[in-house]
């Protein structure tokens, strides 16, 4: 199985010289990092030349604050959450505020992507019994734009609408890019890391207007009861044995 996986990786790197191929061993999970300008072209090649006839899922990812931790687990801490530790990660800010982009010591983890928003697609080849993950990063964090794959796999239509609704990723060429999960008039994109857990507005009954009205959130304060922790113990040491092989051509 490992030989078949590596042989397939060689075929991918030969056919798509600008992509970065990563393999998680021993599971053999393959991920292709594709330049955003080649997103559609690579996906069409995977469908037509490698028989990935089905796209089973597509989603967005927000890497803001990725790799940040609020609590050091390597030693004894004098600041437990019962003592009101002041965290830096997401979930501790109100509307209009932003989480820290660095770690507690002011550095960036080595594997933090430079771009913030990514689109991931999961592909299946029934003919060859293969699965593949394909990822690309939007080049503009302020307005993330990625080409739509509706011409490649028409079934991706609602997946892209979901990613647009929840993350604000714009899929260029999509013919019906509307919200699909949030309510009419919803403000913001709720799966973004800078979207407050308290929300933007709350509802109450207005005695004068005799109806329910939307008002800015004032009754709820941001509160995190579980710390954001990056663990490094025996359990994760075993998982580290499943090393990732990366190859860039």
Swiss-Prot record:
Keywords: Cell inner membrane, Cell membrane, Membrane, NAD, Quinone, Translocase, Transport, Ubiquinone. It comes from the Bacteria. It is a peripheral membrane protein. PROSITE patterns: COMPLEX1_30K. One of its GO terms (cellular component) is plasma membrane. It is found in: Cell inner membrane. The keyword Acyltransferase does not apply. SUPFAM superfamilies: Nqo5-like (SSF143243). Coiled coil: none annotated. One of its GO terms (molecular function) is NADH:ubiquinone reductase (non-electrogenic) activity. Pfam families: Complex1_30kDa. It catalyses: a quinone + NADH + 5 H(+)(in) = a quinol + NAD(+) + 4 H(+)(out). Its EC number is 7.1.1.-. Belongs to the complex I 30 kDa subunit family. NDH-1 shuttles electrons from NADH, via FMN and iron-sulfur (Fe-S) centers, to quinones in the respiratory chain. The immediate electron acceptor for the enzyme in this species is believed to be ubiquinone. Couples the redox reaction to proton translocation (for every two electrons transferred, four hydrogen ions are translocated across the cytoplasmic membrane), and thus conserves the redox energy in a proton gradient. NDH-1 is composed of 14 different subunits. Subunits NuoB, C, D, E, F, and G constitute the peripheral sector of the complex. This is NADH-quinone oxidoreductase subunit C. It comes from Xylella fastidiosa (strain M12).
